[in-house]
């Protein structure tokens, strides 16, 4: 699921290059991170006022990140269920457990990222309204909230060891042009955990650059590194390469798991079509379009999961 972050970081740098007369951080350049612009921003109106900054901190109205973290877990769990013909109640229970864990740990990752980058977020239009950047909460309050998140994550999912990988991402933006690679490891680690969680044995990231593309002009201005800056005008070629690698590995994992025809028709063919449509139809000069395509990337993972589920149902019916 790692192409979406790189894809969303290739756009704003292009708009800066193409519009040299604009101020570096012009007020009119506000982007989709403003909370009131979200389709789910009504959630904040239902919460007590004191809870709102913390809900904003975990991006409660922006579930795409949770989906990108959860779907690799769901693939692995569902493939294990298919492989061993496990009872549906066991599969559903594990899917629910990992779902809660994905929500909690994605929120913890957002908290860590915002704590580390609050001074930079204040200079970027897309992120300047975040709770820490806008001083709605303090670093101490955020740290206390993070402790609660990590405690909840530990009690819910002791096997989902995402903290160490999530925590290192903000630092990687300062030392390497490949921070999305490390974030991709964090988002896809669940693909390695779902199977052993189901079977007590051990027997696959592609869309993160999309997200990074949305911020690349600001990354350059504040000297933060990203794959979008590294790839530059070759972003589409790199994303095509990573997309091909992803769908090839999905197909290979299906072959190794003896998946049936529904898997290849839906998971492989469907995700291939959707990924390459995203990569080749995106205008990297338009930050808002990159943001929309990033949010659509969850459907790539959803298609893969759908194929696994349909294949499992087909197998159970035919047996």
Summary of predicted features, one role per range:
Residues 1-319:
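Multi-pass alpha-helical membrane architecture of UbiA-family
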